[in-house]
Structure formats: C-alpha cells, structure tokens
Regions:
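N-terminal active-site segment of His-dependent metallophosphoesterases
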Residues: 1-68, 140-147
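Beta-strand-turn-beta hairpins that frame and shape the catalytic cleft
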Residues: 1-7, 118-128, 145-150, 198-202, ...
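Accessory, non-catalytic peripheral segments of nucleic-acid enzymes
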Residues: 2, 37-39, 227-318
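Active-site neighborhood of phospho(di)ester-bond hydrolases with catalytic His/Asp-centered motifs
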Residues: 8-10, 43-49, 77-84, 111-116, ...
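Active-site neighborhood of divalent metal-dependent phosphoester/pyrophosphate hydrolases
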Residues: 10-16, 41-60, 77-90, 149, ...
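Metal-dependent catalytic neighborhoods of phosphoester/phosphodiester hydrolases
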Residues: 17-21, 50-68, 87-104, 163, ...
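Conserved catalytic scaffold of divalent metal-dependent phosphoesterases
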Residues: 65, 86-176, 205-207
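Conserved beta-sheet core of the metallophosphoesterase superfamily
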Residues: 163-232
C-alpha cells in the first residue's frame, strides 16, 4: 500500500475513570469521520499522551485505551508513540502504560514505536525521537534516506505557545533538530499550531479533547495530512461537554452566550467557569439560573475578578 494520508491525533489524556462517556462520544465522531472519508490508503497516528495519570492505571483506563486502539485498527493501521503522561520519566525501571496494552492486544495493525529508531511502514519512513531515550541517540534527518521522511516527537519545542499565552523556551528542543526531514508530526503542546511551514513542515496537532478551562473551546480534534504535498487540513471534533468561560459584569450575561447557545457551536453540557465583576450575590444566583436554562450545565465554578482575592460562592453552584 502507498500511504497518501495520515490522520494525526495527539494528547488524548484518557483519565483512569472520569470523563469516559465524554471521550467515547468524541472518539466515535472521529471513527465515523475516518469511515466516512473512505481513504483506504491512510494511517492513523497518535502522537503520545494517550493516558493521563502516567503509570497510575485503572481497569477502566485499560479498557478505554484498548477499545479505541482496536476500533481505529479496524479502519486503518495505527501508529503511536510514547508521551510523558504514558510513562514515568523519573523512574526508567517502571513499565510504560502502553506496552502491556499493546502487547495484550497482539494486533499486527497497531504499531507502537516506543524506541528511538527508523521505522519503514509502507512508503513512509518514520523516525521516532523517543522521550525515553537520550537526545544524543536521535538520528539526524540528513543521515536517513527515504521518499517520505517523517519525524515523530512528543515534547516541548522552542517557541511553541500554549492557549494561556506561555511560550516555550528550550535550547534542547529547537526546530533545527528536525532539519533534513520532510514532515514533523508533534504532540505535547495542546494548542494546535505550525512551528515551521516548510523544509520541514513542523506542526502540533493540539489536544484531541479540550482538557480544562486553560484551553480554548475550539481547535480540538485532528489533522489530516496529505503526504505528497506535505500539507494538512484541520478537523475539529465537537464535544458537548466542553469547558466554557463566561465573564459577567454588572450582573449581565454576555450577549454572545445567549445568541450562540443554540447555534451548535457551544457545548450543550458545559462545565462553566463564571468570572464576575461589579455583581452581587443575588445577581450571581440569577445569572446561574439563566445559564442553567440555556444549557444542561454539568458544573459551575464562580470566581470574582474585580478584587485581588478570588472566592468561590458557596451554595450557589449546586
């Protein structure tokens, strides 16, 4: 098979027992998209952090990861690498989360590329820069031959940005270490972004599912790469359980919340962070009541923003 397309996911962060219904719905949307596309000459690549709690594992976690990898493999071959949340980087004697799961599945269509190395899969030359190995052992792009040299890495690359405005500063992991490759498919930073547009193109897919209020509501899903052109398209996966921040001033809910509540753009079952200023307790109670009319609210946290101290309003969020 000549692979022409790559589905690029990253940073799933499946919990031990929380949010599994939410994740299952998002994953099913992805699987339906892959099936709908009907691109037989494609592979699915997951760029690390499939698990969330490092080596703290639960039976439910094993079940969810096994289910997702198996369902993906029914549609396409699957390639995955290790993320820092899939292992304990501080104790190399501990086994990572993914090895026993993949070994138990014993599925020839699932390729777990745990170690640094060159892996030829069909017409693709995958080069893994494993976080479990020393950087000195990573082969350079120029030292490798191949029609499509694709570097797979999970880690913070210099000048990458997060949704909260933090910029990575790293002398160890710069874009220059990827010189000589055609494409670099990254995981670790949860904000979808392009670090370099060509020679090579270097891209973070971002988190598949919004993790918390520190991440923007949109920009979560996957990328679909065209191997020949070295280009990609962005595909968001709608999540009805998203994290929504609502800023209330003078007791007023912003108009955009009201107008977009039924647009299909906002989550229908949100976790709401309500930040308020110039608003008293009774007005907050009214605002929460109105929000619960607009949405099937999962939870509400309340924070005051017009003073230095931040406080939760007891009894209002139940």
């Amino acid at each position: 098979m000549k692979v022409e397309k790559i589905y690029h996911l990253a940073d799933l962060h499946i919990r031990n027992y929380q949010r599994h219904d939410e994740y299952r719905k998002v994953f099913n949307k992805f699987l339906k998209n892959v099936e709908r596309d009907g691109i037989e000459n494609s592979v699915i690549y997951i760029a690390g952090d499939i698990a969330h709690a490092k080596t703290d594992m639960s039976p439910e976690l094993v079940s969810e990861i096994s289910w997702f990898l198996t369902e993906c493999s029914k549609l396409r071959e699957v390639v995955l690498i290790t993320g820092n949340h899939d292992c304990n980087l501080n104790n190399s004697s501990r086994l990572d989360v993914l090895t026993p799961i993949v070994d138990n599945l014993n599925n020839k269509r699932i390729h777990y590329l745990k170690d640094t190395g060159v892996y030829n899969i069909h017409n693709l030359t995958f080069v893994v820069y494993s976080i479990l190995d020393d950087k000195e052992n990573w082969p350079t792009g120029d030292s490798i031959s191949g029609e499509n040299k694709i570097c797979l890495f999970h880690g913070p690359v210099n000048k990458a940005q997060t949704d909260i405005g933090y910029t990575v500063s790293s002398d160890s992991f710069t874009t220059e270490i990827f010189d000589g490759f055609d494409m670099v498919l990254l995981g670790d930073i949860h904000k979808r972004q392009v670090l370099k547009e060509s020679n090579p193109v270097i891209v973070y897919a971002g988190s598949t599912v919004q993790q918390n209020h520190g991440e923007l509501l949109d920009g979560h899903g996957y990328l679909l790469w065209d191997v020949t052109s070295r280009t990609f398209t962005e595909h968001d996966l709608y999540n009805e359980y998203g994290y929504l921040t609502v800023d209330v001033d003078n007791g007023k809910i912003p108009n955009w919340v009201i107008t977009e509540s039924n647009s299909g753009k906002l989550p229908t079952k949100p976790r709401i962070r309500l930040r308020y200023s110039n608003t008293n307790k009774s007005e907050i109670t009214k605002v929460i009541t109105e929000l619960k009319k607009l949405f099937n609210v999962v939870e509400v946290t309340v924070t005051r923003t017009d003073t230095v101290s931040k406080s939760n309003i007891g009894g209002l969020v139940n």
